């Protein structure tokens, strides 16, 4: 499968001829610019390329995850779990995938607050939403892992061990990262279109956009993805980011 650092957007969204596609190459310096370009294209579609008329102008907002509530859960046996929640001086990443040494699985959880001046109004109409995470490392370095992103609601926003289980914390929807995450993605941002999940979160009236990031269902890959989640001054440039365009 192809590397996960390519994001494809239907050309029809940008007003081009049917059947063609735009490919945006995602790398460590261009991914957030690429997402902004996509959002701008969708904004033009939403308003017909004109500011004239009664249609509200789309708004683009960028929301960093909450490092106090982000975390991961490791399943250590069929009925036991280790929960890590909150970034600290010694913990500045979250994990997703299967440890190739211990064969225990990790699932990462990210929390994006939707309230406040920089959030998304409860009555907003969602145009698009993209999630970006910086791949800090991959274990082993030559491994590859298919990644699934699920919309969940762990409220109050405190993780418990059974949140690992899809049966105990059922997803409201899910999307897949395009292509496996591989060594080529280390040090780069991986982006995934979560528009359908954001629309569902709005429909449910969720006050936070919360996701569970895990290895996709199927045969195990025995590869662990390390997602950067720093609390250092460069957090705005490296932390998980949700970009939402709405009207």
Regions found by a protein language model. Name each.
Residues 50-64, 76, 199-247:
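Proprotein-processing/basic-patch segments
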Residues 43-46:
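C-terminal motif of bacterial Sec signal peptides marking the signal peptidase cleavage site
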Residues 138-207:
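Beta-strand-rich interaction/scaffold domains
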Residues 48-92:
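N-terminal leader/pro-regions and domain N-caps
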Residues 109-113, 120, 125-134, 191-197, ...:
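Residues within well-ordered beta-strands of beta-sheet-rich folds
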Residues 121, 139-144, 219-227:
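Extracytoplasmic/secreted cell-surface and envelope-processing proteins
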Residues 78-137:
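A short beta-strand-loop element at or near the start of a globular domain
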Residues 5-35:
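Bacterial N-terminal signal peptides that target proteins for export
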């Amino acid at each position: 499968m192809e590397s996960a650092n390519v994001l494809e957007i239907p050309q029809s969204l940008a007003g081009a001829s049917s059947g063609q596609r735009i490919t945006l190459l995602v790398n460590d310096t261009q991914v957030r610019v690429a997402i902004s370009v996509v959002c701008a294209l969708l904004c033009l579609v939403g308003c017909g390329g004109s500011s004239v008329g009664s249609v509200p102008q789309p708004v683009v907002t960028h929301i960093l995850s909450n490092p106090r509530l982000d975390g991961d859960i490791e399943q250590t046996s069929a009925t036991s779990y280790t929960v890590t929640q909150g970034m600290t001086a010694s913990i500045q990443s979250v994990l997703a995938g299967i440890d190739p040494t211990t064969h225990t699985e990790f699932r990462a959880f990210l929390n994006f607050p939707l309230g406040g001046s920089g959030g998304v109004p409860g009555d907003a109409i969602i145009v698009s939403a993209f999630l970006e995470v910086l791949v800090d490392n991959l274990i082993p370095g030559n491994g590859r892992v298919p990644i699934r992103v699920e919309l969940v609601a762990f409220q109050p926003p405190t993780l418990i061990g059974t949140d690992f289980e899809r049966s105990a914390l059922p997803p409201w929807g899910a999307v897949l990262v395009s292509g496996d995450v591989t060594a080529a993605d280390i040090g780069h941002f991986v982006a995934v279109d979560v528009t359908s999940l954001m629309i569902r979160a709005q429909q449910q009236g969720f006050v936070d956009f919360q996701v569970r990031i895990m290895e996709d269902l199927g045969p195990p890959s025995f590869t662990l993805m390390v997602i950067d989640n720093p609390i250092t001054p460069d957090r705005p440039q490296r932390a998980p980011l949700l970009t939402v365009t709405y009207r």
